């Protein structure tokens, strides 16, 4: 077991588990010489849990909430704050589909109409089997379409990057000019006050 695994926070437990631990301790105090097997003890606990009032259950639910908050806090410290995903630029060109995805797009409606009860996953698996069974000659039209779409994407991407770099340069220059103007205005006011 690694050092990091030893430091990992203990998982939070449910309200029922809090009740079970409390009930076990009380049972041991009241009947120290009595031994119950796991199955028997679990049955007794579940019967007792069903019989207690909502007010009593609320106490254990509060303990579970506190334990969950503790666990989340410790996990945040253990892993650190999660990094937010970088948002995708809506103006950036979208990546083109592969030859297999083009094949799937063409055959999805057909497979779905033949098998209306199939889920998306089942249709995708069937598409994968169909694609694997195809020969290289049969795959050629899809690969050509994918190559055309990739070439178009590369062109759009280079145009987008040029525009992005131009905007970035313009913003940097305008910020530099604003700084110069501010410094100039500041030096004019200090020179005028002397």
Swiss-Prot record:
<keyword id="KW-0238">DNA-binding</keyword>
<keyword id="KW-0158">Chromosome</keyword>
<dbReference type="GO" id="GO:0008301">
    <property type="term" value="F:DNA binding, bending"/>
</dbReference>
<dbReference type="GO" id="GO:0005694">
    <property type="term" value="C:chromosome"/>
</dbReference>
<keyword id="KW-0677">Repeat</keyword>
<comment type="similarity">
    <text>Belongs to the HMGB family.</text>
</comment>
<feature type="DNA-binding region" description="HMG box 1">
    <location>
        <begin position="9"/>
        <end position="79"/>
    </location>
</feature>
<dbReference type="Pfam" id="PF09011">
    <property type="entry name" value="HMG_box_2"/>
</dbReference>
<dbReference type="GO" id="GO:0005634">
    <property type="term" value="C:nucleus"/>
</dbReference>
<feature type="DNA-binding region" description="HMG box 2">
    <location>
        <begin position="93"/>
        <end position="161"/>
    </location>
</feature>
<dbReference type="InterPro" id="IPR009071">
    <property type="entry name" value="HMG_box_dom"/>
</dbReference>
<dbReference type="InterPro" id="IPR050342">
    <property type="entry name" value="HMGB"/>
</dbReference>
<dbReference type="InterPro" id="IPR036910">
    <property type="entry name" value="HMG_box_dom_sf"/>
</dbReference>
<dbReference type="GO" id="GO:0006357">
    <property type="term" value="P:regulation of transcription by RNA polymerase II"/>
</dbReference>
<protein>
    <recommendedName>
        <fullName>High mobility group protein B4</fullName>
    </recommendedName>
</protein>
<dbReference type="Pfam" id="PF00505">
    <property type="entry name" value="HMG_box"/>
</dbReference>
<keyword id="KW-0539">Nucleus</keyword>
């Amino acid at each position: 077991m690694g050092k990091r695994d030893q430091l990992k926070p203990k998982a939070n437990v449910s309200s029922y588990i809090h009740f079970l631990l409390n009930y076990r301790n009380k049972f041991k105090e009241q009947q120290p010489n009595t031994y119950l097997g796991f199955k028997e003890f679990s049955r007794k606990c579940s019967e007792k849990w069903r019989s207690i009032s909502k007010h009593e259950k609320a106490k254990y639910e509060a303990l579970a909430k506190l334990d969950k908050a503790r666990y989340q806090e410790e996990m945040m410290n253990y892993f650190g704050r999660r990094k937010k995903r970088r948002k995708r630029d809506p103006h950036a060109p979208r990546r083109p589909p592969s030859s297999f995805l083009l094949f799937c797009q063409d055959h999805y409606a057909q497979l779905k109409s033949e098998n209306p009860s199939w889920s998306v996953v089942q249709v995708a698996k069937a598409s994968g089997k169909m694609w694997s069974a195809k020969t290289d000659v049969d795959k050629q039209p899809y690969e050509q379409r994918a190559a055309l779409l990739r070439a178009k994407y590369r062109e759009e991407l280079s145009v987008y990057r040029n525009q992005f770099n131009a905007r970035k340069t313009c913003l940097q220059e305008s910020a530099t000019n604003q700084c110069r103007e501010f410094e100039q205005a500041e030096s004019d006011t200090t020179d005028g006050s002397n």
